[in-house]
Amino acid sequence: MIVIENILGQDVLTEVAAALRELRWEDGRNTAGATARRVKRNQQADLSSRTGSKVREVLLEAVKRHPVVEAYARPLKFAPPLISCSGEGDAYGLHIDNPVMGKGDARLRTDLSFTLFLSPPESYDGGELEIETVFKTESVKLPAGSMVIYPSTELHRVTPVTSGERFVFVGWIQSAIKDAAQRAILFDVTNLKAGLARRFPPGSPELLTLAKTESNLIRMWSDI
C-alpha cells in the first residue's frame, strides 16, 4: 500500500467540485459484484454526460501521469473508474473487489485498487477507508487531492459517514508486473536509481548498470 499526496492541485479540485454538482447520481449498488452489492450503500455519478466524461478524463490522466503511480503500480490497463458520493448514513461494508473487470478485449485482472479523495477530510465525519492487511487494519482518510493505492486482494470497507459528504474517485489497475513482490523490488530499484542520479553524473557506469538491471528485471517479469 502507498499514499501519494497532491495528485491534484487546488484549482483542479475546485473545478471538479463544481462539476460534481452538475452530474446525475444513481444507486452505487448497480456496479457492485454479487457479494459487495449486499453491503454497498452510496451514490455513484453517471459519467456518460459531457461533463462526466470530462471530469473522468481529468482525474484519470492525473493518476496516469504521476511518476510514483507509474513506478509503484507499473500500470498495463486501467478499468473504467467511478466517482462515488457517501452521504450521512452511507457506508460500504467489508468486501473484496471483483478479480476480473470489463468485457471482451477490455477485460482485465485487478491487481491494484486506488481511491483518490476529492473532499477535504474536515468536510465529513466518518467515511474512513479501512483495509484489512495480514498484520493490521489500515485506516485511510486523506486530504483532497491525495490518493491511496492498495492490493485488490485485500478485504476493505468504508465506515459509515455520520455527517457531510465524501466524494472519491475510485479505480483499478492491471499491472504489467503481476507479482506484488516483484513490483516491490522494482519500486526499490527505481527509488535507488533516482537517489543515485543525484550523486553520479549521467552516463556513469553506476547509473548505466542500474538502468540495465531495472530494464532486464522488467523484461523478465513483465506479463504482457
Curated annotation (Swiss-Prot):
Keyword check for Oxidoreductase? yes
Domain (Fe2OG dioxygenase) spans 77-175
Specify which residues bind Fe cation according to the UniProt entry for this protein. H95, D97, H156
Question: What InterPro entries would the database entry show?
Answer: Oxoglu/Fe-dep_dioxygenase_dom, PKHD_hydroxylase, Pro_4_hyd_alph, Pro_4_hyd_alph_FE2OG_OXY
Q: Which UniProt keywords apply?
A: Dioxygenase, Iron, Metal-binding, Oxidoreductase, Vitamin C
Q: Which residues bind 2-oxoglutarate?
A: R166
Q: Give a GO biological-process term.
A: intracellular iron ion homeostasis
Give the domain of life: Bacteria
EC number(s) stated in the UniProt entry for this protein: 1.14.11.-
Gene3D superfamilies attached to this UniProt entry: q2cbj1_9rhob like domain (2.60.120.620), Rabenosyn, Rab binding domain (4.10.860.20)
Q: How does the cofactor bind to this protein, according to its record?
A: Binds 1 Fe(2+) ion per subunit.
Required cofactor names:
Fe(2+); L-ascorbate
Which Pfam families does the entry link to? Answer: 2OG-FeII_Oxy_3
Please provide, alphabetically and separated by semicolons, the GO molecular function terms listed in this UniProt record.
2-oxoglutarate-dependent dioxygenase activity; iron ion binding; L-ascorbic acid binding
The cross-references to PROSITE patterns, in alphabetical order and at most eight, read:
FE2OG_OXY
- Is DNA repair included in the keywords of this UniProt record? no
What SUPFAM superfamilies has UniProt attached to this entry?
Clavaminate synthase-like
Name-wise, this protein is PKHD-type hydroxylase HNE_1625
What organism does this protein naturally occur in? Hyphomonas neptunium (strain ATCC 15444)
